[in-house]
Every structure is written in C-alpha cells, then in structure tokens.
Design a protein with these regions (language model features):
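Two-component system phosphorelay core
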Residues: 1-57, 61-114
Length: 114
C-alpha cells in the first residue's frame, strides 16, 4: 500500500500532510510509529475508570497526534470527544466513543499494510 492509499483508506489528507512534511520517508516513519503511541489506550482506560481529567488529556493528545499525521477522520472523532470532556467534565454522550474506536482500528489495520 502506498502512503496515498493509506491516507485515502483512513480518511486522511495526504496532500496537506505532504505539504507540511515534504519527505515521504519521514511521513511514513511517523505513521509507522502511531501504533506505539499510548494516548488511545490511556483514553480507553480513562473512560472505563470515568477519570475525566485523564480522558481530556488523553483525547487531547490523540487529537494532536492524529492532526499532525493528517489522519483527519481520527482527528475529528477525537476532537469531538475531547470537547465533550473538556473542563474536565463527564462524558454525557457515549456515542462519541465508537467513532474514535473505529477510526483508531482503521488506522491500525492500514498501518499493518504499509
């Protein structure tokens, strides 16, 4: 799979990412590191524990990682959840979690094919 195909699959913007980081090798290097980023698992654990401060921090970090890597679908899902727990305050809309989970799993599956 090419990086362009990867970005199409995960709902990302390869052109915008490439304009910020002109080296395709560098983009691929950082994309391949995504599975090792702890923010998603920290977010999952925080939501399970109803630790809203940690949920905010983890979702904010995940949002930033996704945005920096041009993974727009994951970024938008994480941003919506981040805004919901900002304060920090309890997550009142549980429907915000499944899009984050789905986008994360989609990225992981696509990374395995790079």
């Amino acid at each position: 799979m090419t990086l362009q195909e990867f970005y199409a699959r995960v709902g990302g913007d390869y052109s915008a990412t490439h304009s910020r980081r002109p080296s395709e090798a560098l983009i691929k290097k950082f994309v391949l590191k995504y599975p090792g980023d702890p923010s998603f698992e920290q977010l999952r654990a925080a939501l399970d524990a109803q630790d809203w401060e940690l949920a905010f921090r983890a979702s904010h970090t995940l949002k930033g990682v996704a945005q920096n890597l041009g993974m727009d679908r994951l970024y938008k899902a994480a941003a919506a959840l981040c805004d919901a727990v900002r304060g920090p305050k309890p997550l009142e809309d549980a429907s915000l979690w499944p899009p984050v989970l789905a986008a994360h799993e989609e990225v992981l599956a696509a990374v395995r094919e790079l």
